[in-house]
Amino acid sequence: MSRKGSTPQRNVLPDPKYGSETIARFINMVMKSGKKSVAEKIVYGAMNVIGEKNSNAIELLQKALDNVSPAVEVKSRRVGGATYQVPVEVRASRRMALAMRWLIDSSRKRGENSMPRKLAAELLDASESRGGAIKKRDETHRMAEANKAFAHYRW
């Protein structure tokens, strides 16, 4: 572990089409193997699909992220010989990162024929509080609720 402390968080430039930092971060998380143009096509394609069904795609993305973002999660903490799953609150930056990651992962598992359609369908579902990403959030909250007794082991 580094002794110099944590590195400062780098700021992300807003995306060229919508001028939104959130969408720029989303594109970066969709990206695989440095292929940013492919990731942009996927995200902008999904936004276009959403735009056909819904008036404001950016608002819908924000609503989906808010719905999926977890309030608490569990972290492993070793006490004596036992390992406890201790519930801890999630800070805002990690909350957004987890929400984006879960949306992308669950959209990749969907059955639609192209990634932009999969992502659009998952975003629409998440904005209406259903879908794979919402299940993941609920599962995380359930784990935290089940291990509430170990909350005093927080650090």
Curated annotation (Swiss-Prot):
The UniProt keywords, alphabetically, are: Ribonucleoprotein, Ribosomal protein, RNA-binding, rRNA-binding, tRNA-binding
Q: What's one GO MF term for it?
A: structural constituent of ribosome
Q: Which CDD domains match?
A: uS7_Bacteria
Instruction: Name the species this protein comes from.
Output: Xylella fastidiosa (strain Temecula1 / ATCC 700964)
Keyword DNA damage among UniProt keywords = no
Query: What is the protein name stated in its UniProt record?
Result: Small ribosomal subunit protein uS7
Q: InterPro entries, from UniProt?
A: Ribosomal_uS7 (IPR000235), Ribosomal_uS7_bac/org-type (IPR005717), Ribosomal_uS7_CS (IPR020606), Ribosomal_uS7_dom (IPR023798), Ribosomal_uS7_dom_sf (IPR036823)
NCBIfam families (UniProt xref): rpsG_bact
Gene3D superfamilies cross-referenced by the UniProt entry: Ribosomal protein S7 domain
